[in-house]
Every structure is written in structure tokens, then in C-alpha cells.
């Protein structure tokens, strides 16, 4: 899954985003996590799962 697709999916789940210097801060369910900002690149599956786990989605 490309990072831009993952970001759209997170936004549909209610996530809010704030730009960092080289990353995006993701706010969801009162928790914060970060993800790299490379919208055209594939996001590795382990990283995607970690980003979902931190705010308690999966």
C-alpha cells in the first residue's frame, strides 16, 4: 500500500495530521504516532502495522 493511500484510509478513520520536518504526526483516539513522509513510496507492512497498533486501531 502506498503511503498516500494509507494516509487517506487513516483520515477516513478520523485521524488528523500535522507536518513535522521529515515526518507526519498522526493524531487518532487521543494518541499520537509518526510516519515518514514519502507519499509515492510503498509503506512496509511491519511499519503499517506498528502505526495502526500505537493508537489502538488493530
From Swiss-Prot:
Entry's EC annotation: 3.1.-.-
Alphabetical list of InterPro entries matching this protein: HicA_mRNA_interferase, HicA_sf
Entry GO MF terms: endonuclease activity; mRNA binding
EC category: hydrolase
One Pfam family linked to the record: HicA_toxin
Signal peptide from the UniProt entry: none
The entry's keywords: Endonuclease, Hydrolase, Nuclease, RNA-binding, Stress response, Toxin-antitoxin system
Source species, domain of life: Bacteria
Subunit composition and interactions: Probably forms a complex with the cognate antitoxin HicB 2 which inhibits the mRNA interferase activity.
Function: Toxic component of a type II toxin-antitoxin (TA) system. A probable translation-independent mRNA interferase.
Family: Belongs to the HicA mRNA interferase family.
Protein name: Probable mRNA interferase HicA 2
Taxonomic lineage: Bacteria, Pseudomonadati, Pseudomonadota, Gammaproteobacteria, Enterobacterales
Amino acid at each position: 500500500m502506498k503511503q498516500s493511500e494509507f494516509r487517506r484510509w487513516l483520515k477516513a478513520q478520523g485521524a488528523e495530521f500535522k507536518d513535522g520536518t521529515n515526518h507526519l504526526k498522526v493524531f487518532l483516539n487521543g494518541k499520537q504516532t509518526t510516519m515518514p513522509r514519502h507519499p509515492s513510496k510503498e509503506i512496509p507492512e511491519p511499519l503499517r502495522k506498528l502505526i495502526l497498533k500505537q493508537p489502538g486501531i488493530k
